[in-house]
Amino acid sequence: MDFVLNTIQWLREVPRNFKGEVATVVFDDSADILVYCCVLYILLVFMVPEHIMKNREPFNLRLPFVVWNIGLCLFSICGAYSCVKNMTALYWERGFYRTTCFFDSSVAYDGEFAFWVFYFILSKIPEMIDTVFLVFQKKPVIFLHWYHHLTVAIFCWHAGHALIPSGLWFATMNYCVHSIMYFYYFMCACGMRKVIRPIAPFITMMQLLQMVAGTLIVLYTAYHSYLSESGCEVDRTSIRLGLVMYGSYFFLFAVLFGKLYLKKQVKPSGTASAYAMSKKRNGEKMA
């Protein structure tokens, strides 16, 4: 029992003792790591299915997939709890404008909040392992899936380098959505797709709302940076990247939502029916 309590106490102390210099070293001096990871990811998406897995049977990765998803779910829940708690306090103390446009190093550079934002950014690289499971199980990798993983890793790394205050909102929203999304994937991996399936439209809607909120926040910072006399300290390159990223995400998720849940289901027959059932079994649902 003492071991458990000591472990819990240690896990609480680690985020509180986090120093922002670690993030500075990673994001300022190690940008080449991001490049290597992105190149390997592109090779994974476009080369492995055709040249390595083409004539091979799919791997049975169910157990690793279960462990992977519950791990990301728990990580996201912890991050969501901390970020929501700290972001709420910061908002009530400073208001939306100062929270979004001005970086408070006393809150977001050291300590618990900074710890979870730092690991949120870093997590975008290992999250690419989602695609590894798809590729080696010979499941389809749709454009939205790999485009989202690739661009969000690049944007988040730049945000960590530029220390954009609006990124605190982005991290908080993403943690909340991912805590539910990865729980859904965990349940599906455990063979309970039929039980959990009714919440799938809700998850896609949450993702859409996240894109809307993200776009509005970027537009808000763009207005204060380019037009308002009050100004905004968010890096302008980050603003432009954010507009492209969130705008494209919203469009792609909206198309996916319409394709999955709004179009009338026409019962196919013959080969078309077999193809549709194959796609369903392969899990071509969400990014």
UniProtKB/Swiss-Prot annotation:
It catalyses: a very-long-chain acyl-CoA + malonyl-CoA + H(+) = a very-long-chain 3-oxoacyl-CoA + CO2 + CoA. Disulfide bonds: none annotated. It is a multi-pass membrane protein. InterPro entries: ELO_CS, ELO_fam. A motif (HxxHH motif) lies at residues 145-149. Involved in the synthesis of fatty acids. Elongates C16:0 and C18:0 fatty acids to C26:0, with C24:0 being the main product. This is Very long chain fatty acid elongase 4.
